[in-house]
Amino acid sequence: MGNCLYPVADDNSTKLAIKEDFLIDFPEDYYPDYNETDVEAAAPCHSCSLLNYSSLPFFILVSILGILASGTILYALLRPLFRWQLYQDRSTLVQLAVGSALFSIVVPILARGLSGALITSLCHLAHLVAYGSAFAQALLIGYHACLGPQLGAGQVPGLRLGVTVGLWGVAALLSLPVVLGSDTSQGLCTVTFSGEWETLRYIHAAACFAIFVLLPLGLLGTKGLKTVLGRAPCPWVDVLWVWFIFWWPQGMTLGLDSLVRSKAIVVSTCPAQQALDMLLDVAEALAILHCVATPLLLAWVCYQATHTSPPSLPLPTTQTSHLDTLGGKS
């Protein structure tokens, strides 16, 4: 994509003068098939990036707000008095806040306008933390929707640690393609997927499409199907599902961009390519904003949990039979 602040130098005026002096000696019918439109169509297509050098204040502001908001909600979740008032799966909410805080910390490193002597390992680490935390948050929300209330009631002991390690491990593996594809170019930490890493571009796009697009669609489809059939309430719907609104466009646009790059979809006009580039930038900006929105969503979940009664869950079969026995003896 091109850069609006530093456009490509246009010396067409000089070339046009030389061209007119050169062609004045030739008859008008010397180039019978010459078409000016064909020459313009063959010119390179330059897009104006929205997240260019001037977007550095946006990255810094989002980072500061995200760190402050995430730190505040973490302090509230870890308070001893508050943990007894929270009927939700508190460990999952804490992990979501930690993921949001980690993303907020590395946002300035990913900024377009932050130039300097960035080392490659720091760039790799920033992308690992950013996408690893994003994938982990998505998986945690899906896990919380399916098992959160049950785990909060203490009916699945010993499962939290294994699920936590597994989810964050899977998130780290899913972020490896973008980590290997990132590099420092002219002092900027960017994702290039150059050389032998070109294949990783499609793997990364597939991972984003699966986690940010297919996962929420699967949750919605399962919830709708179980509602129609009158089955169990799982997955439980809460305000945390709003989180996917910030990353759903990112998964869609990366998938579309991969189809265009692989020639599965042919973009024949420059305005269409420019529109796709703009959508990619808008989706990236919206995804970055999630680190500010996530603490607000967590605060709303905590408010609802502390002002409502704990969810009623079916008792296990063994516990029900034991209660019946006690009732018969009485």
From Swiss-Prot:
InterPro entries: Duffy_chemokine_rcpt. Disulfide bonds join C45-C270, C123-C189. It is a multi-pass membrane protein. Keywords: Disulfide bond, Endosome, G-protein coupled receptor, Glycoprotein, Membrane, Receptor, Transducer, Transmembrane, Transmembrane helix. Residues 79-89, 148-160, 223-238, 303-330 are cytoplasmic. Glycans are attached at N12, N35, N52. Gene3D superfamilies: Rhodopsin 7-helix transmembrane proteins. The chain crosses the membrane at residues 58-78, 90-110, 124-147, 161-181, 202-222, 239-259, 282-302. It is found in: Early endosome; Recycling endosome; Membrane. One of its GO terms (cellular component) is membrane. The keyword Transmembrane applies. One of its GO terms (biological process) is chemokine-mediated signaling pathway. GO terms for molecular function: C-C chemokine binding; G protein-coupled receptor activity. Residues 1-57, 111-123, 182-201, 260-281 are extracellular. Belongs to the G-protein coupled receptor 1 family. Atypical chemokine receptor subfamily. Atypical chemokine receptor that controls chemokine levels and localization via high-affinity chemokine binding that is uncoupled from classic ligand-driven signal transduction cascades, resulting instead in chemokine sequestration, degradation, or transcytosis. Also known as interceptor (internalizing receptor) or chemokine-scavenging receptor or chemokine decoy receptor. Has a promiscuous chemokine-binding profile, interacting with inflammatory chemokines of both the CXC and the CC subfamilies but not with homeostatic chemokines. This is Atypical chemokine receptor 1. The gene is ACKR1.
